[in-house]
Amino acid sequence: MKFTTVATVFAISSLAAAKGGEKDHGKASTVTKYVTETTHRYGRFDKTSRSKKPKETGTHRYGKFNKTPRPVTTTVLVKESDLPKKRDAVVARDSKNASSNSTTSSGNNGVATGVSLGLAGVLAVGAALVI
């Protein structure tokens, strides 16, 4: 069925349903209920009490597991006389490893791209023939 046919039938049926039945034109009464009058307060029942006092187990505190050790931090004091020596050591180490024996070539990159595109085309044609 077409969408327009379904939409037209739906509109006609909703109009027919809206016309039937008597309407109440009287004034509605409003009832106001405050939160303090209900049975729930802050997510708990107001009228119930705990049967026994909870015991402190020592493993949980404030809803979290309390056996996790605190992180240990240490403070290291650095003298001004140590900084130039360490800076020179870093520069010297960097200059020793400046050369590398690796070479790169991009001469055959176009061939590899063409082969992969050709393979993808063959796979696409094969899939089309199967379907």
Swiss-Prot record:
Belongs to the PGA14 family. It is found in: Secreted, Cell wall; Membrane. Residues 106-131 form a propeptide. Hydrophilin which is essential to overcome the simple stress of the desiccation-rehydration process. Residues 1-18 form the signal peptide. It is a lipid-anchor; GPI-anchor. The GPI-anchor is attached to the protein in the endoplasmic reticulum and serves to target the protein to the cell surface. There, the glucosamine-inositol phospholipid moiety is cleaved off and the GPI-modified mannoprotein is covalently attached via its lipidless GPI glycan remnant to the 1,6-beta-glucan of the outer cell wall layer. A lipid is attached at residue 105 (GPI-anchor amidated serine). The gene is PGA14. This is Hydrophilin PGA14.
